[in-house]
């Protein structure tokens, strides 16, 4: 298996590139995503996550799941069922507290599933 070679900042860059590669967006959405691109993953808020397109949120959660595994080679798999289970919980937790740390909310929900 491939060892995880990315750090949290690399993950953020990849997530941001994917988020910004979508079609035309409203100017405020562009500004929001541009601001998000300047943040480290640990600095993202639930509000940042809430601003993403719904269809992209599972991708972001997938990155979080991967990095939460702490780079262990034996854990370097994509758990689609787990991601599908935890994504709605993270979305709901972030709706409840938009100013909260996205990373901390995601970690709390991941502990319940993984």
Swiss-Prot record:
GO cellular component terms, A-Z: outer membrane-bounded periplasmic space
Secretion signal, residue range per the UniProt entry: 1-26
Pfam families: HdeA (PF06411)
Top-level taxon: Bacteria
Compartments (UniProt record): Periplasm
Gene Ontology BP annotations: cellular stress response to acidic pH
Family annotation (SUPFAM superfamilies): Protein HNS-dependent expression A, HdeA
Described purpose of this protein according to its UniProt entry: Required for optimal acid stress protection. Exhibits a chaperone-like activity only at low pH by suppressing non-specifically the aggregation of denaturated periplasmic proteins.
Similarity remark: Belongs to the HdeA family.
Protein name according to UniProt: Probable acid stress chaperone HdeA
Source organism per UniProt: Brucella suis biovar 1 (strain 1330)
Gene from which the chain derives: hdeA
């Amino acid at each position: 298996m491939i060892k995880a070679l990315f750090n949290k900042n690399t993950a953020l860059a990849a997530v941001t590139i994917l988020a910004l590669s979508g079609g035309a967006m409203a100017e405020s959405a562009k500004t929001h995503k541009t601001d998000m691109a300047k943040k480290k993953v640990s600095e993202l808020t639930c509000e940042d996550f809430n601003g993403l397109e719904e269809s992209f949120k599972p991708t972001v959660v997938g990155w979080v799941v991967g990095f939460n595994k702490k780079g262990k080679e034996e854990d370097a798999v994509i758990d689609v069922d787990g991601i599908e289970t935890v994504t709605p919980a993270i979305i709901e937790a972030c709706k409840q507290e938009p100013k909260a740390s996205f990373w901390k909310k995601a970690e709390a929900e991941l502990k319940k599933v993984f």
